[in-house]
């Protein structure tokens, strides 16, 4: 290993990429150093005061600077080797000069000289000593610093470490010279943890380059229209490449999933069937064979033991038959199938266990009667009976608890989120449909072509004329086009996507007829799906293409809106009209889609900015709804665990009462302990109960809602059982206990209807009435022209008068939105203020303070009315001595 000169005072920044454990990047600069090693702290030794021959100059410089020196371990051991090898030193100096001038030169002579000097074969390149390219570096500070390290420069530094050393020493010294410093990543991790869920990822560096724009919107394939939900995933290879996985859609025609229809023959069910056959056979033999009829065991007939074993082993099998009969009866009733079947399948295991234990208890009670207890003279039978009763009571209580929790959770989600889920899925359907080909127009064209082909065919039959071969080929092509499978499935009832839902079925749903199965499926679509463009619904697409179509940020939403606008509008058109929507949607869907845009119902057109705002708003709504459902699901699970603890305590108390353990003295001790627990945890239990009532009964907000509490506007960030996290206007997180929020008035902007606003300005009292009338007319015409912003005909009133000098005029107008998006509100308000100011300048309406008449009646007397000794302070320096 080559010795290191003390004049090598280069500054190193060594950065480690957290994603690649073995990646190290280093940079350095030096003008007169020869060493190129990367050191770590354990490879430094303090200089002992002796001066080498080759570092005299560097020592003088360090003494002048008052600094101390470092020497790498093993330096003295290899100093003679370096002195005996002057070409190596010259080559090193040459390489450093080239590096300082900005050139990078790779010399293979270094490797050859190292081989000749060490007389060892060259070390093969491995994962540990081969430099890596493309390293992402992180400096000591929390901000990331990107440094490019050229592989050949690192290779030269590594090769110089092998000069003059043996193979063993070479490996050891290379292990010593690896890393200088490792930057801490804790600040960056802490920032990632505190990031808001409602904020978007950073905007790409080059916003003009969009991966969705680079992909063609006219990808070939069969379009699956009318489906909403998760994007299809790439499946197994088929005849035409990768085909999507076909999953059953069990929710289209009925409300029962296919997985519950299929009978599952497990290993235990198979054993139960074998046991049933064997035990029934032995029971028949014991009842028919004379020798076995008199056989007893513990003074009990053999057939009674066989019946007991039959109930214990095969009781679950018999109880499953009873459950199947109950389910069959429920399925036959339409109302029960909509409302009850979900809960029946949810608790079928608990019902099966209850029936099984009930059969066991009946068999035990009637077979092991009082006579057997007297003959055996044992009290164990009594305790066995009590234990069976305890288990049966526990299962019944647990069954009731499960049913209540499922019913309450389903009714809560259905009454609170069904309308929002339905609207969000329809918005997703509109976005996906408008981003694809005009299917309705294509369908109409194919129907016309099909009709023409049929007319020509019928005419040929009636007239008896023969068509030319070219015309026959054209007619056949028309008939083939008319049978396109992708278009015939627009109104079909059956699909292939198990996680999707058809738009016609979605429109028929409401809070009265939606089943619990469908409600659960809709929630899963929101939680697991994402808004995307139409490209993902084509066949023969890869996972990369599907990811490129998903909308995961507001920037991607704006790109999707731009793509939709160019796809829907005619060439050269600046607006989207209802006729453009009719090329993609049916008439009912097109009218409903037009009503989603602000001001489109009055102006009958949609601008590009209006479309962009709508897509961004749809993305925000979808993200907030997904976060709300996720937090609500988490809260329900935690509430379920709390109820499990409470029910467990109740079951234990009931067990003690049934087993007779709870005597009077025991109850007295237990009551005293309960009083102590109530004194300690009573306030906490009260807080938890109030928080549960606030979250599930009152439920004044959801994630993403803008609220006003104590005069401060806050945005809901996260909802928990005990607390709610808010974001203030400056993104400061504020945590409120739910029990405290239950006692405060909460204003919810999101749930409010279209809200009003007021703009006030003052004019002088002497302003002519003609100008005031003119400014009123200008304001009214401006607001009426902005139909997508405000409702027409705002109120303009004289609000107040200030000391007979000015009159305050107020403009009361109503936005076509609520104040959930406060930034958009102030943007529109600013536009109106600019218009008011522009109008005032054009009409020469200014607020000028007219001169006031001041009458001076008397002045205070002075000692010398003609002169005064007072002078300004600045004149003091100008006076002479």
Curated annotation (Swiss-Prot):
Which chain regions cross the lipid bilayer?
265-285, 309-329, 349-369, 387-407, 642-662, 677-697
Region Disordered, annotated ranges: 1-248, 861-881
Biological process, per Gene Ontology? monoatomic ion transmembrane transport
Phosphoserine sites (modified residues): 231
Q: Where is the composition biased (Basic and acidic residues)?
A: 1-12, 48-59, 169-179
User: Which SUPFAM superfamilies does the protein's record reference?
Assistant: Sm-like ribonucleoproteins
- Role noted for this protein: Mechanosensitive channel that opens in response to stretch forces in the membrane lipid bilayer.
Name of the protein in question? Mechanosensitive ion channel protein 5
């Amino acid at each position: 290993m080559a010795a290191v000169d003390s004049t090598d005072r280069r500054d190193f920044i060594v950065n480690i990429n957290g994603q690649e454990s073995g990646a190290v990047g280093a940079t350095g600069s030096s003008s007169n150093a020869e060493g190129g090693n990367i050191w770590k702290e354990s490879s430094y030794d303090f200089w002992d005061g002796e001066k080498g021959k080759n570092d005299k100059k560097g020592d003088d410089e360090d003494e002048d600077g008052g600094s101390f020196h470092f020497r790498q371990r093993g330096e003295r051991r290899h100093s003679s080797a370096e002195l005996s090898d002057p070409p190596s030193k010259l080559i090193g100096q040459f390489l450093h000069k080239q590096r300082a001038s900005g050139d990078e030169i790779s010399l293979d002579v270094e490797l050859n000289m190292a081989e000749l000097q060490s007389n060892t074969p060259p070390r093969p390149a491995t994962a540990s000593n081969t430099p890596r390219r493309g390293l992402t570096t992180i400096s000591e500070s929390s901000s990331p610093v990107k440094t490019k390290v050229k592989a050949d420069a690192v290779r030269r530094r590594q090769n110089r470490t092998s000069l003059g050393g043996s193979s063993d020493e070479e490996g050891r010294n290379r292990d010593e010279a690896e890393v200088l410093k490792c930057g801490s990543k804790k600040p960056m991790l802490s920032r990632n943890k505190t990031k808001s869920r409602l904020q978007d990822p950073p905007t790409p560096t080059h916003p003009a380059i969009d991966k969705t724009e680079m992909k063609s919107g006219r990808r070939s394939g069969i379009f699956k229209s009318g489906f909403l939900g998760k994007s299809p995933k790439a499946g197994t290879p088929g005849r035409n490449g990768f085909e999507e996985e076909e999953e059953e859609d069990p929710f289209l025609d009925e409300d029962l999933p296919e997985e519950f229809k299929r009978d599952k023959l497990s290993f235990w069910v198979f054993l139960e069937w074998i046991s049933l056959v064997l035990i029934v056979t032995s029971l028949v033999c014991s009842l028919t064979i004379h020798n076995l009829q008199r056989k007893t065991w513990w003074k009990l007939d053999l057939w009674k033991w066989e019946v007991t074993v039959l109930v214990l082993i095969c009781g679950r099998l018999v109880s499953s038959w009873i459950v199947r009969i109950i389910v069959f009866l429920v399925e036959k009733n339409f109302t029960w199938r909509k409302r009850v079947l979900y809960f029946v399948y949810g608790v079928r295991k608990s019902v099966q266990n209850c029936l099984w234990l009930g059969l066991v208890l009946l068999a035990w009670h009637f077979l092991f009667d009082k006579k057997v207890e007297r003959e055996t003279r044992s009290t164990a039978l009594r305790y066995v009976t009590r234990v069976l009763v305890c288990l049966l009571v526990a299962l019944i209580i647990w069954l009731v608890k499960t049913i209540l929790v499922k019913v309450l959770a389903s009714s809560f989600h259905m009454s609170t989120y069904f309308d929002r889920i339905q609207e969000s899925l329809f918005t997703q359907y509109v976005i996906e449909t408008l981003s694809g080909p005009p299917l309705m127009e294509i369908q109409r064209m194919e129907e016309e072509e099909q009709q023409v082909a049929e007319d020509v065919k019928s005419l040929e039959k009636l007239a008896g004329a023969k068509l030319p071969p070219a015309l026959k080929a054209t007619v056949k092509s028309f008939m083939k086009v008319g049978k396109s499978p992708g278009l015939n499935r627009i109104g079909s009832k059956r699909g292939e996507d198990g996680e999707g839902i058809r738009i016609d079925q979605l429109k028929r749903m409401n809070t009265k007829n939606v089943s619990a199965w469908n409600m659960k499926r809709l929630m899963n679509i929101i939680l697991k799906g994402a808004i995307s463009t139409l490209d993902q619904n084509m066949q023969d697409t890869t996972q990369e293409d599907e990811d490129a179509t998903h909308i995961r940020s507001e920037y991607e939403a704006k790109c999707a809106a731009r793509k939709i606008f160019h796809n829907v509008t005619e060439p050269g058109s600046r607006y989207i009209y209802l006729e453009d929507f009719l090329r993609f949607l049916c008439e009912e869907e097109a009218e409903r889609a037009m009503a989603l845009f602000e001001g489109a119902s009055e102006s009958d057109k949609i601008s590009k900015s209006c479309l962009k705002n709508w897509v961004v708003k749809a993305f925000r709504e979808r993200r907030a709804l997904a976060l709300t459902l996720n937090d609500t699901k988490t809260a329900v699970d935690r509430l379920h665990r709390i109820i499990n603890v409470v029910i467990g305590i109740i079951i234990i108390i009931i067990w003690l009462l049934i087993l007779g353990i709870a005597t009077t003295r025991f109850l007295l001790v237990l009551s005293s302990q309960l009083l102590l627990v109530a004194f300690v945890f009573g306030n906490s239990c009260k807080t938890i109960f109030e928080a549960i009532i606030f979250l599930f009964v009152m439920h004044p907000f959801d994630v993403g809602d803008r609220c006003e509490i104590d005069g401060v506007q806050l945005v809901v960030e996260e909802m928990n059982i005990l607390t709610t996290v808010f974001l203030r206007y400056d993104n400061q997180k504020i945590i409120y206990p739910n029990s405290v929020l239950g006692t405060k008035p909460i204003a919810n902007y999101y749930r409010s209807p279209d809200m009003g606003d007021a703009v006030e300005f003052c004019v002088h009292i002497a302003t002519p009435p003609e100008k005031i009338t003119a400014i009123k007319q200008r304001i009214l015409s401006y607001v009426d022209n902005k139909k997508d912003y405000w409702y027409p005909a705002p109120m303009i009133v004289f609000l107040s008068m200030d000391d007979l000098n000015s009159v305050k005029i107020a403009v009361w107008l109503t936005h076509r939105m609520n104040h959930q998006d406060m930034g958009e509100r102030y943007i529109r308000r600013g536009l109106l203020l600019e218009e008011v100011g522009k109008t005032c300048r054009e009409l020469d309406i200014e607020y000028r303070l007219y001169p006031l008449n001041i009458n001076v009646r008397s002045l205070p007397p002075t000692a010398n009315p003609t002169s005064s000794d007072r002078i300004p302070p600045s004149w003091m320096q100008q006076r002479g001595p």
